[in-house]
Curated annotation (Swiss-Prot):
The keyword Transmembrane helix applies. The keyword Cell inner membrane does not apply. It is found in: Endoplasmic reticulum membrane. Pfam families: Reticulon (PF02453). It is a multi-pass membrane protein. It comes from the Eukaryota. PROSITE patterns: RETICULON (PS50845). The gene is RTNLB10. Coiled coil: none annotated. This is Reticulon-like protein B10. Residues 14-201 form the Reticulon domain. One of its GO terms (biological process) is response to bacterium. One of its GO terms (cellular component) is endoplasmic reticulum membrane.
Length: 201
């Protein structure tokens, strides 16, 4: 039995959010990110003043709420215990460590192993990121990432068979083109240092 997209996402609340099982949370996330993107990107609002003003407004509202509660004998506002746990810090640090080690392993494979294929793959990815970065800034890319994370799993769950078929076809085409590039270009790059060594001997 194939594992569904919802089951493959290990965190239940996150799965409910991006699969639109939690519609309220999904609309809240999409609406808030859209509002923030509009404020920063279109209205020219700066991030630091936004954070400071939001904190200032929150503190003033809570202070007035607490004062009015004392005056009118109403219950005080219930605030959650806001703190970052050690487990969360260790989890984030471990995820960052794994990512950094992966990057260093790829760099070592290219430098020490002289892996031309890996160099080609990394170069294509970095060039693509650079090309996209010429047209979109970091905030817009981050916003698009949130929107796509809410759309792609939901659409894939609905049209999984059709998408798998198209992706399989696309993968075969890319593999065919990659083999051609590998035969024409990469093998020549690999062969040149070998020929130079033979001539020196």
């Amino acid at each position: 039995m194939e594992e569904s997209v919802h089951q493959s996402i290990r965190f239940g609340s996150v799965a409910d959010l991006i699969m639109w099982k939690n519609r309220r949370g999904g609309f809240l996330l999409l609406g808030s990110t859209t509002l923030l993107w509009f404020l920063f990107e279109k209205c020219g609002y700066s991030f630091f003043p936004f954070v400071v003003n939001t904190q200032l407004l929150s503190v003033v509202i809570l202070f007035l709420w607490a004062k009015s509660a004392i005056l009118f004998n109403r219950p005080m506002p219930q605030l959650p215990n806001l703190e970052i746990t050690e487990e969360f810090v260790f989890m984030v640090a471990d995820a960052i460590r794994v990512w950094i080690n992966t990057v260093l392993a790829v760099a070592r494979e290219i430098y020490v192993g002289r892996n031309a294929k890996q160099l080609f793959r990394v170069s294509v990815v970095l060039w693509t990121v650079s090309f996209v970065g010429n047209f979109l800034n970091f905030l817009t890319i981050l916003y698009l990432g949130v929107v796509l994370s809410l759309l792609i799993p939901f659409l894939y769950e609905r049209y999984q068979d059709l998408i798998d078929e198209k992706l399989s076809l696309t993968h075969r085409v890319i593999q065919t083109q990659y083999r051609k590039i590998d035969e024409r270009l990469l093998q020549k790059i690999i062969a040149k240092p070998t020929n130079k060594i033979k001539k020196m001997q």
